[in-house]
């Protein structure tokens, strides 16, 4: 049934593209349409697998996810999958890539710092991430609390 729905959407999109060509308007390539549909399908499959607890299935569907092509909620799901599968190097790379697109989000910054401290014991980078957020976006009690927790946990 899902394949039928996707196929119907693809045919409708192709027909719309053909209609645009016939009207001498800006055209969208068939390859672009197919790639967009495949990407959307992968994201939906990945989220469904994640919600069912299938981390490997979620990883396989989301592993090519780019922060530029998604929203914060979906990207956070991808980060959770990487954490659950202990794909540490990919997780660090994804965190850094995501900060370029979601660095203005308090939730992303808090999650980033939490992962750095809890999974990698990297309090220096976590501190920098939180301090940079405060410098750019002003005071925030949650960010300040997280920063204070790092400061107190590293003092001995």
Give the predicted meaning of each segment.
Residues 55, 88, 122-123, 156:
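TPR-repeat structural position
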Residues 52, 85, 119-120, 154:
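Structural motif corresponding to the intra-repeat A-B loop/turn of tetratricopeptide repeats
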Residues 2, 11-78, 84, 89, ...:
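N-terminal leader/linker segments that initiate helical-solenoid repeat arrays
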Residues 64-65, 97-98, 132-133:
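Canonical positions in the second alpha-helix
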Residues 77-78, 111-112, 142, 146-149:
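Canonical tetratricopeptide repeat
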Residues 67-68, 101-102, 136-137:
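Structural marker of alpha-solenoid helical repeat scaffolds
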């Amino acid at each position: 049934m899902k394949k039928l729905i996707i196929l119907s959407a693809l045919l409708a999109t192709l027909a719309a593209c053909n209609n645009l060509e016939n009207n001498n308007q800006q055209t969208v390539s068939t390859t672009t349409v197919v790639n967009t549909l495949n990407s959307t399908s992968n994201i939906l499959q990945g989220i469904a697998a994640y919600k069912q607890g299938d981390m490997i299935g979620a990883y396989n569907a989301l592993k090519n996810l780019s922060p530029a092509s998604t929203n914060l909620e979906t990207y956070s799901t991808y980060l959770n999958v990487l954490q659950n599968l202990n794909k540490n190097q990919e997780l660090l790379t994804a965190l850094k890539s995501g900060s370029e697109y979601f660095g203005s989000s308090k939730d992303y910054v808090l999650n980033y710092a939490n992962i750095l401290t809890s999974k990698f014991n990297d309090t220096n980078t976590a501190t920098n991430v939180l301090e940079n957020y405060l410098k750019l976006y002003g005071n925030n009690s949650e960010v300040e609390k997280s920063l204070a927790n790092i400061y107190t946990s590293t003092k001995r």
